[in-house]
From Swiss-Prot:
Residues annotated as catalytic: 445 (proton acceptor)
Gene Ontology biological process terms from the UniProt entry: regulation of ubiquinone biosynthetic process
Binding positions (ATP): 206-214, 311
Locations listed in the record: Mitochondrion; Membrane
Top-rank EC class of the record's enzyme: transferase
Keyword Lipid metabolism part of the UniProt annotation: no
Protein name: Uncharacterized aarF domain-containing protein kinase 2
Protein task: The function of this protein is not yet clear. It is not known if it has protein kinase activity and what type of substrate it would phosphorylate (Ser, Thr or Tyr). Involved in the mitochondrial import of CoQ precursors, plays a role in muscle mitochondrial function and fatty acid beta-oxidation.
Gene Ontology molecular functions: ATP binding; protein serine/threonine kinase activity
Membrane topology: Single-pass membrane protein
EC number, UniProt record: 2.7.11.-
Keyword Transmembrane helix: yes
GO cellular component, one term: membrane
Length: 626
């Protein structure tokens, strides 16, 4: 279905007058608008018209941008004349100009590095310098290429260990966009009276990444949907009723809520471009906005405020990501003809990365993932996720509870009690194993910056319960107050997740069991049988090397706790790359998550034994279906 778009000539001409030629770089930028918003014009009228003219916005999976070209004349019979897009040539000129300018800038950065690549075989120092230059070029190429570098560093079955080690450092703190853009997004999402919903003490963000930036604010709970209040209560460390005197439940505690939660939308039912470009009013099942009638004209009362984190996408991000993905697809097809890298199937890699970027630039995906994790861990008090506060969830803005906690890296330092370190390490490993083998829903971005620790200061060696008395009118109330929040992990940034199909999950369990049993040849057979692509020309040699690798790793260790799984998996990845065996993307993501968590866990507890911890999960099987 071709999406109808209408933009007047006056709007296009106003965009044309607004832009001037930027000297030196030959880039177009707005003369009156803020510099950081120079890409926003693409969403205002030109890109939707060109897309509707040149490409088919089809129904399908999120990774489908436009699989076939259509002619406007062919769409004439699909509906009445008034539904047809009227796209003039001006939009096409703008889009092609932007594409050529962007392609030229990227070519200037990366083509010299491509020409210098043969020199990396001369000496290791030259290779290190080349990787450093590639890293710097990626850092300055925008959010799409930064995310591509971060994702590539997790695919150790495709890229060298030196490349992955270098690009694992690619965590860039981006200069925050101005407050005016944040205010504009808030107004679009929640109406002109958004100040009645959110209160900001400081307009400076507490963090800024390449995709979004985060503010700390306070939200009025009177506008939360019923289900959000219930999830908020379940996820909170609330004291018993004898402390607060509340007897009416959470509904009275947070205020009466008349409207129930809308049914969650199915993002997979909307095509990629529709989700990115259609106005919020046109989104099927969208809960993107709060009508102005729902928002009172007064400031929120202090008694109804809770601390929240407000994540806001950077302006112009959608247009830039769409443009970069298009250029990546073109580049992957050009580079795919080279014999040395043909086995990588670069177009397929770009499609996998496109799925990841779709999840990153639509914050509704992260909200859904957080709610999914909360359901999976509803009976696990030692793991917590921020609670998305609906209806304050849109494509560009996500409001969630603000979790006061400490980064897990703070507990890697000397002076931290050994028992506390050991507990944190065990919590992390058990959490990951549950995600993999029980839930089949894995947080795929588990670097230390996204893992926080809560309640470490509340641990006490005293087990004695303290009684509390309260004289309420003529009634003596005796209660046992709840202790401080227990030690638990808080996971952030759940925009990227990994799930395995049922056959892949069974294969993963079998591979893990074969590693535990020291059956290296069995590991090789399983990997070859379920590999996404393979140009292995020496199958028997691959099996022999894998058997020697696993056997040698087991021989050098007296007990399983001495076996470093991350080192073993790193060697397995080297072998896969040498024999040109490509893993399925989610399979590789989960293996990499195990490597990261085991490395983090052993930095806290050197005696951590992930294989021993995995035995119950491997023997009992999944509790719930994948």
């Amino acid at each position: 279905m071709v999406a109808p778009w209408r933009v007047s000539v006056r709007v296009c001409l106003s965009h044309l007058r607004c832009f001037e030629l930027r000297q030196g770089l030959s880039l177009l930028r707005p003369s009156e608008c803020p510099r950081d918003a120079r890409l926003c014009w693409l969403l205002l009228g030109t890109l939707p018209k060109v897309v509707s003219l040149c490409g088919d916005v089809g129904e399908g999976a999120p990774d489908v941008l436009s699989r076939r070209r259509v002619r406007c004349s062919g769409a004439a019979g699909a509906g009445p004349a008034e539904s047809l897009p009227r796209a003039g040539p001006l939009g096409g000129v703008f889009l092609h100009l932007r594409l050529w300018l962007r392609a030229g800038a990227l070519l200037v950065k990366f083509f010299p590095l491509l020409l210098l690549y043969p020199l990396t075989y001369l000496a290791p120092s030259v290779s290190t310098l080349w990787l450093h230059l590639l890293l710097k070029a990626t850092e300055t190429s925008g959010p799409t290429y930064i995310k591509l570098g971060q994702w590539a560093s997790t695919r150790r079955d495709l890229f060298s260990e030196a490349f992955c080690a270098q690009f694992s450092k690619l965590h860039v703190r981006v200069t925050p966009h101005p407050w005016t853009h944040t205010e504009r997004f808030l107004r679009q999402a929640f109406g002109d009276d958004w100040g009645s919903i959110l209160s900001f003490e400081n307009r400076e963000p507490v963090g800024s990444g390449c995709v979004a930036q985060v503010y700390k604010a306070y939200a009025n709970t009177a506008f939360l949907e019923t289900d959000s209040v219930q999830r908020l209560g379940r996820a909170s460390c609330l004291p018993p009723f004898s402390h607060t005197g509340a007897v009416g439940g959470l509904r009275e505690l947070f205020g009466y809520l008349g409207n129930g939660r809308k049914p969650p939308e199915n993002l997979a039912d909307q095509s990629f471009l529709e989700r990115l470009l259609l106005p919020k009013a046109d989104l099927v099942g969208s809960n993107a906005g709060v009508s102005r009638a729902q928002v009172p004209g007064h400031q929120p009362e202090a008694t109804n405020l809770i601390s929240v984190a407000v994540k806001v996408l950077h302006p112009g991000l959608l247009a830039q990501v769409h443009m970069d993905l298009l250029l990546m697809k073109i580049g992957s097809r050009v580079l795919g003809v080279l014999p040395g890298i043909k086995w990588l199937s670069l177009p397929e890699i770009v499609e996998e990365f496109e799925k990841l970027m779709v999840q990153q630039i639509d914050l509704r995906y992260e909200a859904q993932n957080l709610e999914h994790f909360q359901v999976n861990f509803r009976n696990v008090k030692a793991v917590k996720f921020p609670t998305p506060l609906r209806p304050f969830v849109t494509r560009e803005v996500l409001v969630e509870t603000y979790e006061e906690s400490v980064p897990v890296s703070s507990y890697q330092q000397a002076g931290i009690p050994v028992d506390l370190k050991r507990k944190i390490a065990r919590l992390g490993i058990n959490m990951l194993l549950k995600m993999i083998f029980v839930d089949n829903f894995v947080h795929a971005d588990l670097h230390p910056g996204n893992i926080l620790v809560q309640g470490a200061n509340g641990l006490s060696s005293s087990q004695e319960a303290q009684l509390q008395q309260a004289d309420i009118c003529d009634t003596l109330v005796v209660a046992v107050p709840s202790s401080l929040c227990p030690l638990r992990l808080v996971l952030l940034d759940a925009g990227i997740v990994a799930e395995l199909q049922a056959p892949d999950l069974r294969n993963f369990r079998a591979v893990f069991m074969a590693v535990v049993m020291g059956q290296g040849q069995r590991v090789a057979e399983l990997i070859l049988h379920h590999a996404r692509a393979s140009e292995c020309r020496d199958v028997e040699g691959f099996k022999t090397e894998m058997a020697m690798l696993v056997t040698q790793a087991r021989k050098n260790t007296i007990t399983l706790e001495k076996l470093h799984v991350s080192s073993l998996l790193s060697s397995v990845f080297k072998l896969l790359m040498t024999h040109k065996v490509k893993l399925e993307s989610n399979f590789a993501s989960i293996v990499f998550a195990i490597m990261v968590l085991e490395g983090l866990g052993r930095s806290l507890d050197p005696k951590l034994d992930i294989l021993e911890a995995a035995r119950p999960f491997l023997l009992t099987g999944p509790v719930c279906p994948p």
